[in-house]
From Swiss-Prot:
GO terms for cellular component: cytoplasm; small ribosomal subunit. Belongs to the bacterial ribosomal protein bS16 family. This is Small ribosomal subunit protein bS16. It holds the Pfam family Ribosomal_S16. One of its GO terms (molecular function) is structural constituent of ribosome. Keywords: Ribonucleoprotein, Ribosomal protein. The lineage of its organism: Bacteria, Pseudomonadati, Pseudomonadota, Gammaproteobacteria, Pasteurellales. GO terms for biological process: translation. The gene is rpsP.
Length: 82
């Protein structure tokens, strides 16, 4: 099954997440199919906190991909802001 989920990057105690489309059997930070955005929970000032390609997310959901809980909340946040 294909899921849209967060993949952790960044330094120790300073997380930075890529929003990726991946097979649910692959490791959290492992192989992915497509990168559809990023999420920076520690963004301050003019730094961009969240970027998401909603067209690609919707295309993957139409193909049967499921959203993780956190990504689902982020998608709703982007849709509310738009």
């Amino acid at each position: 099954m294909v899921t849209i989920r967060l993949s952790r990057g960044g330094a120790k105690k300073r997380p930075f997440y890529q929003i990726v489309v991946a097979d649910s059997r692959s490791p959290r930070d492992g192989r992915f199919i497509e990168r559809v955005g990023f999420f920076n929970p520690l963004a301050t000032g003019k730094a961009e906190r969240l970027r998401l390609d909603l067209d690609r997310v919707n295309a993957w959901v139409e193909k049967g991909a499921s959203l993780s809980d956190r990504v689902s909340a982020l998608v709703k946040e982007v849709q509310k802001a738009a």
